């Protein structure tokens, strides 16, 4: 979630992760962001996008896609909403954009605020989540991360044409004890002991 709301995530955490990626010199890293508009001003997305775009200048990480939290962070089993996020992340389905800030402004002009931003992807960046990829989900609150994590890494939903991928899936906190194969950076039982994240090597990636 791309904001400084501090309820589900914080942009400072993202900036720290981006610095870590540079330290490890990791290739082919893509950012798929969810706009907020609920815990912060409903039209503050442009500011946060600009902040990260500036941060990424000359960096390995590329800003690949945007979608509102209404779709990507549903928690009420509205799978038709989650499907829009899944298809953006996995199949690159959405509206092409050459400039996310301009595209957000266009949405604002149409009365669509950050929470409800429709899926869009950077037209000059061909990035989608594929089998064998590493995924790092940096939200720290658990409730609104479960459904998108479930469809990406846990269970198939044939009715909505969503099936999990074979991913090295990493979360900042433990979203659900029942999830299989998910790596947790800061586990709830003893958060002090989880102060070092072991990243895959270039060979693993």
Regions found by a protein language model. Give the residues of each.
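Gly/His-enriched, cation/cofactor- and phosphate-binding structural elements
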Residues: 143-190, 194
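Beta-strand elements within well-structured catalytic alpha/beta cores of enzymes
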Residues: 1-4, 30-32, 85, 134-141, ...
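Short connector loops at secondary-structure junctions
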Residues: 33-40, 66-73, 167-186, 197
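Conserved small/polar residues in nucleotide/adenosyl-binding loops
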Residues: 195-201
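Active-site histidine-anchored catalytic micro-motif
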Residues: 1-20, 24-51
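Long, well-ordered, tryptophan-enriched scaffold segments
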Residues: 40-130, 136, 143-145, 153-159, ...
């Amino acid at each position: 979630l791309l904001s400084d709301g501090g309820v589900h995530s914080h942009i400072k955490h993202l900036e720290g992760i981006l610095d870590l990626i540079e330290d490890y010199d990791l290739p082919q890293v893509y950012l798929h962001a969810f706009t907020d508009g609920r815990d912060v001003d409903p039209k503050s997305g442009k500011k946060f996008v600009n902040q990260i775009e500036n941060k990424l200048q000359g960096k390995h990480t590329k800003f690949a896609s945007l979608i509102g939290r209404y779709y990507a962070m549903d928690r009420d089993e509205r799978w038709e909403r989650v499907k829009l996020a899944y298809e953006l992340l996995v199949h690159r389905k959405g509206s092409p954009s050459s400039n996310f800030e301009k595209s957000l402004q266009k949405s604002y002009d149409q009365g669509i605020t950050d929470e409800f931003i429709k899926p869009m992807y950077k037209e000059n960046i061909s990035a989608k989540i594929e089998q064998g990829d590493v995924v790092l989900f940096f939200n720290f609150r658990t409730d609104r991360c479960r459904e998108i994590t479930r469809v990406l890494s846990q269970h198939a939903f044939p009715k909505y044409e969503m099936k999990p991928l074979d991913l090295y899936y990493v979360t900042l906190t433990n979203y659900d004890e029942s999830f299989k194969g998910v790596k947790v950076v800061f586990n709830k039982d003893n958060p002090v002991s989880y102060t070092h994240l072991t990243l895959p090597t270039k060979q693993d990636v």
